[in-house]
């Protein structure tokens, strides 16, 4: 076998007959499989040991030679080679076909490759191949046309007319084979190139397609006649096994049935030919042989599929590769692994952030080999067998050994569905009793896990390298930030939030108010002994608290609460004291009003202060983000654990409970509803009198009930008691929101009907009062719709993620700086008055392209090619700069990836991205993972003024990434200039917009009901939208440049996600959009050897042009093509990646004809062949490093060179570096 990590590329071509013979170990002549009595394979049958190898290791069929010492000997009695059984998985056989047979992939595929090669229609081909018509192979001197088709009857008539032997016409695959042999590729290609110079329309399209196929044959060295099979390979028997079932019956792979049909028909045909049977019988047998081979290769592609028992279609070779259950997706891209287990998860509140609880019986099973090795090493038993017995008996001594073995041996926990990389994290195992895995409560958000019966899988990394990577790169404590937006993904939730909220509350007039303490311990002691309440405002000496005080703040008394003293106790030392829950306090320190000179009038000072709100979930998130920014991961994860413990402790002490009496009652609810009823009556009256339309009435009624619900909501909020447990849960962000609260205490409001339209009858009751039967019935509609929507959304979102991953999986950070001279000019993204994404957010973590200066003073804020930090971004925006040119993925020149400077920081770590980071996959996950949060629906804009549906949510994202024509498309102008007139034409119900510019005039017809974005006298740019709606990106590409289209797509995706409150970094969307515009269509080949009309990678196109320009020729011209992500994935340079994505047979057919070479640059290709992926630590530049020991002395005191040798030293160092670079490449 070839070592997978050795080879550089993989090529696929058509197999010539000689190639098939060279693979084969012998001919399969009989359809028999296994002898039913002896259960031994039959000779010359489909499982023959002589051809395929022995069924038992190191043993021939007759048993003359047994044991390994006879390896390689071929038995003189039975002819079987003594070797491993494993060869039955790799040795192939063959069947010599008695008549040539066409390969269905090349004849039936779309477009038909055989048809294009011969310039015949697939219909005509089918008639010839299946013996329904003759084709003229050589007309000789007759007036018949070469390749013309004739029926049996016509053939007889022509024979009578011109005489026997006056021309050659044949039927069947044999005829096609003769025609294919006659094709002169060079001559045909030259003729087609000539034809293309003048051809137009349909002729031109056909010529381009033919040229493409013929050129593929010519360049790859494949011969067209190899599309016809004279010899059929038989795959190894262990890949189509026969298994004996309990009842003595056999279960066999469908392929055996299909092969059996071929062999039977082939043998019958041979016998008929020997007997010189009548032509019609032979013809029929040949047709049946052709059909049998078709079914074997791709059953059901032509006509009705061959079925097995129970009329189930048999699975052919093509089906073995296709689809989710095919070879690619089932066995190559994802495999089941050893050393893994799964169990239900339970919460582990006492664990540290980097730990997980593993049940003892699970751990002993997972770490069995490690424990056994240790048992033998300690001489408890003598050999491994005995050690295994010891473990299986559950001996007492194994538990201590297990404890030691798992120490510092991380395990991976994974929860399905793994939507992003945080779905697999590493933990240090802690042995526990019970049978459930214990999970740290803070990592639940990343996994999207809860403890209502979720299960998780556990995996053990075995090798030292795998353990090191798990520990350094995947440890849960390292994953503080979410890769999609760089915000903390581990924020306290539920009880933890509630505890910290309760802890930091302030109340006026509670016991012990105004007491002053010398330090924290005294305050805690007073609290424990009941002298002071947790929420009482007290004083504490600032000097006793280890915080970064200013000079004025020292030697003072700080006014705070006991709870806040405890809360600040867990914070890192360098952080300011947190007194107010806002960012100013977090970054600049406590405001001056909370400080009092020693011995000042404290009670008076306290009474002058307003009560502060407690710390809510959002504030805790900001604190964590700030701490991460200042102290990085280790300190942050330690703080998170302290915050978790504090939160759980105090939510327990607070003892918050919920009773029905905690739901407040709004006194004037009846009046509010009565008022609305009256208004609705008035609206209905107006409608009855014909003053308003039905649509207007509907909108007015629903608006009225919405207003009523909002009024109730406002009353509720105004009257709420801050110490009400439900209000505390809601306000802190622990659970529930204002809408839930208003359904409990206000009114449920309007509901959606099953068709998605909002019903006019609102639900007036709330849950405290209880719903009437009719109201209950109405509310079930909404609930049901919610459930179905979620189910559909999950599937759609998952498929979107799969397509995104596929198109971007080969985008890896490949170099430090690509040295591009272009940049991207960015400003904030806004929709009308609404800000979608601010400039500050867009700048953070990117590199500048040009110097940014202060618009007023002209002072340099930041130079070119410098990283814009959060603070720099704020400084740029505060200076009043509105647009900045940055380095962007769009303008990066790196081949097969991106460079570090164009990408910026890695959002998951907050540091500059490393070479080797698989940014394409991360981008795909970041866009796909929040997909389930997006809505499914297409909104009707409501009201009368529009007749267009605006697509939003998930369908809109799919529309953008698939580059489809959008629903509700906007009309765009191709002229830059001024709108001179807008004319309405009532007869055709359209409007005409006239635009006059320097380059010419444009006249655009828009629907009568479309809402205009321009008015007469307004200026418009090229590609600007004249009406409301979405622009079709392909049209925009025709009038503007690539960068404008990329920028438009980026903005559109951001609008969808941000409108749903999902934040995604620009760079992720940039990576995806760049993959959609990677191809160029050749318009004129110039002096290059490119073909007109072909799609090619933009890099290959520029390379071809470079070579021609250097030689002084005319370069080719091309037009950039925008493709949807599905098409872009299938057009990738890697055929393995494309075939494992979709349309497997089409991709492989095409790749084989072209003799495509897969250079294994992406991740999928390498996973498929089992090679280590070329990203992260698997990248060549990291794999080829040779570690060597350094003498400590030299390391600490490097030897000083003498002055004379300086130059030579430098040169030596340079060449050394260069050679290293070369080997790394």
Swiss-Prot record:
TM annotation in the entry: none
Species this chain originates from: Streptococcus pneumoniae serotype 2 (strain D39 / NCTC 7466)
Tree of life domain: Bacteria
Group of enzyme by EC: transferase
Subunit structure: The RNAP catalytic core consists of 2 alpha, 1 beta, 1 beta' and 1 omega subunit. When a sigma factor is associated with the core the holoenzyme is formed, which can initiate transcription.
GO BP of this protein: DNA-templated transcription
Names of the cofactor(s): Mg(2+); Zn(2+)
Family listed: Belongs to the RNA polymerase beta' chain family.
Function: DNA-dependent RNA polymerase catalyzes the transcription of DNA into RNA using the four ribonucleoside triphosphates as substrates.
An annotated Gene Ontology molecular function: DNA-directed RNA polymerase activity
Binding of Mg(2+), residues: 450, 452, 454
Binding site for Zn(2+) 2: 818, 892, 899, 902
Protein name stated in the entry: DNA-directed RNA polymerase subunit beta'
Cofactor, how bound (note): Binds 1 Mg(2+) ion per subunit. Binds 2 Zn(2+) ions per subunit.
Binding residues annotated for Zn(2+) 1, in chain numbering: 60, 62, 75, 78
Catalytic activity: RNA(n) + a ribonucleoside 5'-triphosphate = RNA(n+1) + diphosphate
Alphabetical list of InterPro entries matching this protein: DNA-dir_RpoC_beta_prime (IPR045867), DNA-dir_RpoC_beta_prime_bact (IPR012754), RNA_pol_asu (IPR000722), RNA_pol_N (IPR006592), RNA_pol_Rpb1_1 (IPR007080), RNA_pol_Rpb1_3 (IPR007066), RNA_pol_Rpb1_3_sf (IPR042102), RNA_pol_Rpb1_4 (IPR007083)
GO annotations of cellular component type: DNA-directed RNA polymerase complex
């Amino acid at each position: 076998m070839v070592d997978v990590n050795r080879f550089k590329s993989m090529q696929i071509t058509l197999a010539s007959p000689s190639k098939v013979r060279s693979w084969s170990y012998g001919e399969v002549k009989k359809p028999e499989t296994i002898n039913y009595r002896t259960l031994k394979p039959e000779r010359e049958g489909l499982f023959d040991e002589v051809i395929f190898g022995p069924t038992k290791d190191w043993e021939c069929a007759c048993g003359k030679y047994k044991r390994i010492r006879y390896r390689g000997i071929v038995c003189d009695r039975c002819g079987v080679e003594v070797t491993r059984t494993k060869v039955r998985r790799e040795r192939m056989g063959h069947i010599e076909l008695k008549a040539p047979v066409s390969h269905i992939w090349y004849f039936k595929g779309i477009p038909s490759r055989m048809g294009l090669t011969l310039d015949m229609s697939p219909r005509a081909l089918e008639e010839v191949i299946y013996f329904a018509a003759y084709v003229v192979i050589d007309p000789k001197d007759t007036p018949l046309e070469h390749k013309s088709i004739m029926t049996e009857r016509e053939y007889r008539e022509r024979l009578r007319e011109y005489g026997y032997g006056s021309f050659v016409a044949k039927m069947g695959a044999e005829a096609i084979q003769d025609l294919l042999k006659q094709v002169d590729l060079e001559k045909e290609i030259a003729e087609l190139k000539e034809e293309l110079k003048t051809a137009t329309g349909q002729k031109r399209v056909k010529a381009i397609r033919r040229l493409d196929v013929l050129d593929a044959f010519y360049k790859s060295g494949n011969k067209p006649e190899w599309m016809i099979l004279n010899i059929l390979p038989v795959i190894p028997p262990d890949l189509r096994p026969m298994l004996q079932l309990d009842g003595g019956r056999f279960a066999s792979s469908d392929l055996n049935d299909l092969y059996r049909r071929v062999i039977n028909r082939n043998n019958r045909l041979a016998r008929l030919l020997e007997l010189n049977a009548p032509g019609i019988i032979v013809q029929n047998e040949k047709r049946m042989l052709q059909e049998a081979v078709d079914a074997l290769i791709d059953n059901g592609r032509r006509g009705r599929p061959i079925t097995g028992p129970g009329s189930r279609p048999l699975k052919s070779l093509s089906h073995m590769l296709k689809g989710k259950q095919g070879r690619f997706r089932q066995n190559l891209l994802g495999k089941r692994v050893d050393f893994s287990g799964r169990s239900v998860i339970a919460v582990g509140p006492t664990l540290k952030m980097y730990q997980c609880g593993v049940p003892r019986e699970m751990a002993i099973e997972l770490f069995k080999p490690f424990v056994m090795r240790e048992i033998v090493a300690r001489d408890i038993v003598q050999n491994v067998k005995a050690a295994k017995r010891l473990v299986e008996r559950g001996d007492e001594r194994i538990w201590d050994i297990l404890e030691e073995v798992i120490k510092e041996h991380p395990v991976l926990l994974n929860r399905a569905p793994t939507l992003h990389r945080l779905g697999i994290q590493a933990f240090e195992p802690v042995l526990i009793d019970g049978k459930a895995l214990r999970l740290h409560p803070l990592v639940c958000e990343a996994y999207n896990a809860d403890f209502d019966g979720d299960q998780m899988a556990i995996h053990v990394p075995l090798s030292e390298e795998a353990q090191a990577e798990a520990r350094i790169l995947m440890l849960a404590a390292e994953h503080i930030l979410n890769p999609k937006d760089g915000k903390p993904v581990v924020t306290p939730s539920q009880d933890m939030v509630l505890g910290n909220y309760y802890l930091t509350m302030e109340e006026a007039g509670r016991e012990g108010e105004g007491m002053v303490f010398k330090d924290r311990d005294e305050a805690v002691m007073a609290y424990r002994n009941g002298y002071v309440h947790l929420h009482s405002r007290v004083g504490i000496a600032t000097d006793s608290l280890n915080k970064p005080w200013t000079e004025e703040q020292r030697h003072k008394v700080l006014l705070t609460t006991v709870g806040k003293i405890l809360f600040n106790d867990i914070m890192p030392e360098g952080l300011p004291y947190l007194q107010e829950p806002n960012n100013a306090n977090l970054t600049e320190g406590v405001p001056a009003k909370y400080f009092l000179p020693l011995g000042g009038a404290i009670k008076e000072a306290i009474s002058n202060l307003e009560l502060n709100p407690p710390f809510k979930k959002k504030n805790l998130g900001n604190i964590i983000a700030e701490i991460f920014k200042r102290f990085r991961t280790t300190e942050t994860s330690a703080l998170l654990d302290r915050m978790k413990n504090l939160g759980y402790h105090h939510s327990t002490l607070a003892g918050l409970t919920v009773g029905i009496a905690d739901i407040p009652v709004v006194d004037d609810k009846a009046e509010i509803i009565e008022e609305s009823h009256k208004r609705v009556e008035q609206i209905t009256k107006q409608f009855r009198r014909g003053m308003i339309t039905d649509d207007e009435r509907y909108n007015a009624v629903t608006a009225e009930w919405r207003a009523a619900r909002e009024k109730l909501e406002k009353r509720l909020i105004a009257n709420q008691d801050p110490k009400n447990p439900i209000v505390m849960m809601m306000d802190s962000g622990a659970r529930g929101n204002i809408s839930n609260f208003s359904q409990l205490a206000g009114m449920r409001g309007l509901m959606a009907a099953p068709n998605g339209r909002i019903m006019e009858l609102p639900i007036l009751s709330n849950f405290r009062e209880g719903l009437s039967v009719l109201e209950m019935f109405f509310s079930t509609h909404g609930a049901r719709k919610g459930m179905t929507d979620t189910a559909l959304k999950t599937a759609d979102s998952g498929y979107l993620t799969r397509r995104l991953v596929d198109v971007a999986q080969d985008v890896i950070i490949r170099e430090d700086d690509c040295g591009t001279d272009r940049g991207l000019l960015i400003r904030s993204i806004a929709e009308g008055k609404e800000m979608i994404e601010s400039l500050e957010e867009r700048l953070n973590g990117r590199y500048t392209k040009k110097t940014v200066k202060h618009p007023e003073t002209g002072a340099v804020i930041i130079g070119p090619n410098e990283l814009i930090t959060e603070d720099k971004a704020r400084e740029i925006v505060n200076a009043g700069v509105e647009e900045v040119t940055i380095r962007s993925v769009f303008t990066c020149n790196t081949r097969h990836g991106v460079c570090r400077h164009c990408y910026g920081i890695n959002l998951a770590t907050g540091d500059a991205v490393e070479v080797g980071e698989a940014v394409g996959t991360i981008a795909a996950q970041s866009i796909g993972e929040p997909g389930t949060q997006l809505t499914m629906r297409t909104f009707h804009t409501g009201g009368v003024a529009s007749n267009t549906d605006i697509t939003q949510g998930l369908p809109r994202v799919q529309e953008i990434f698939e580059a489809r024509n959008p629903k509700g498309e906007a009309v765009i102008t191709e002229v830059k200039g001024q709108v001179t007139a807008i004319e309405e034409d009532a007869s055709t119900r359209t409007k005409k917009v006239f635009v006059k510019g320097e380059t010419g005039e444009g006249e655009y017809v828009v629907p009568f009901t479309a809402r205009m974005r321009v008015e007469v006298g307004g200026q418009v740019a090229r590609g600007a939208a004249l009406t409301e709606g979405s622009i079709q990106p392909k049209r925009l590409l025709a009038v503007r440049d690539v960068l404008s289209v990329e920028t438009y797509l980026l903005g559109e995706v951001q609008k969808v996600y941000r409108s749903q409150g999902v934040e995604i970094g620009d760079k992720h969307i940039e990576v995806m959009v760049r993959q959609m515009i990677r191809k160029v269509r050749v318009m004129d080949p110039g002096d290059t050897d490119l073909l007109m009309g072909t799609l090619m990678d933009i890099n290959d196109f520029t390379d071809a042009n470079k070579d021609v320009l250097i030689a002084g020729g005319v370069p080719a011209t091309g037009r950039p093509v925008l493709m949807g992500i599905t098409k872009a994935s299938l057009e990738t340079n890697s055929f393995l990646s494309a075939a494992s994505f979709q349309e497997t047979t089409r991709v492989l057919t095409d790749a084989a004809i072209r003799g495509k070479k897969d250079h294994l640059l992406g991740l999928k290709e390498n996973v498929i062949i089992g090679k280590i992926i070329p990203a992260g630590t698997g990248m060549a530049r990291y794999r080829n490093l040779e570690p060597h020991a350094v003498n400590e002395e030299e390391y600490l005191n490097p030897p000083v060179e003498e002055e004379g040798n300086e130059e030579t030293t430098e040169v030596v160092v340079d060449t050394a570096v260069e050679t290293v670079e070369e080997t790394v490449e």
